A protein has these predicted regions:
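A glycine-rich helix N-cap at a beta->alpha junction
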Residues: 172-185
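Bacterial N-terminal signal peptides
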Residues: 12-20
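Small-aliphatic-rich amphipathic alpha-helix that forms the alpha element of a beta-alpha
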Residues: 66, 70-71, 113, 126-170
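Conserved hydrophobic/aromatic beta-strand scaffold that supports enzyme active sites
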Residues: 43, 112-116, 182
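Solvent-exposed coil/turn segments that connect beta secondary-structure elements
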Residues: 89-90, 118, 159
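Bacterial N-terminal signal peptides that target proteins for export
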Residues: 2-11
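N-terminal amphipathic, basic helical "cap/leader" segment at the start of enzyme domains
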Residues: 25-111
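Conserved small/polar residues in nucleotide/adenosyl-binding loops
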Residues: 184-192
Length: 192
């Protein structure tokens, strides 16, 4: 990497950080509940990776809200290069648990939401991999939404491991232009 490329990259990173740090500061008071607490920040700090679940099903309204929250994530040039696959079929969940080395907890989960990159919607050229960032932001929104609803969830990486991508693609019959980035298994937390 030459000096001009490094400078361009650092300038972009610095600009992004500066915008993040100064943007939205004027309305901080509107983000607080009447108690004076910033519930968004508290939700971020409360979120944990949960790997023990109850078998209690999740209501369709909650699943829809989780996906809507994921879709509210920012994306480069508003491309929204994602697809979400909600899996609640026990046989498919068990296959995912059997096929993926770090997803054994899926055997307990009542559902999984698979976050995929849709390459037909992705940017072209040197920004052709921004879909990964966009899908990661969507995944974090999904995890935070699950936390706010009292659901436990964990994300399990699939991409960039080609063997995992192939296994998920096979189990879910995904077309070639859809790449599974990761999936989450939201569920009511096992508190016992």
């Amino acid at each position: 990497m030459n000096a001009a490329t490094i400078f361009k990259t650092l300038t972009t990173v610095t600009l992004s950080i500066t915008l993040l740090m100064t943007g939205g500061c004027n309305n901080m008071e509107t983000k607080k509940e009447e108690t004076g607490k910033n519930t968004a920040i508290e939700n971020i700090f409360a979120r944990k990776s949960v790997r023990a679940y109850t078998s209690q099903p999740i209501e369709k309204e909650k699943v829809d809200l989780l996906v809507k929250a994921a879709m509210a994530a920012p994306t480069a040039v508003n491309k929204q290069p994602w697809a979400f696959v909600v899996v609640d079929d026990r046989t498919v969940l068990d296959k995912l648990a059997a096929e993926l080395p770090y997803a054994k907890m899926t055997a307990q989960a009542p559902l999984a939401i698979v976050v995929c990159g849709d390459l037909s919607k992705a940017l072209n050229g040197e920004k052709d991999r921004y879909w990964m960032l966009d899908c990661s932001a969507a995944s974090e929104n999904l995890l935070l939404a699950a936390e706010s609803m009292g659901l436990g969830a964990v994300w399990t990486a699939v991409y960039p491991e080609n063997d995992r991508i192939a296994k998920v693609r096979s189990v879910l019959s995904l077309p070639d232009h859809i790449i599974c980035l990761l999936y989450t298994s939201p569920s009511p937390r096992d508190r016992g």
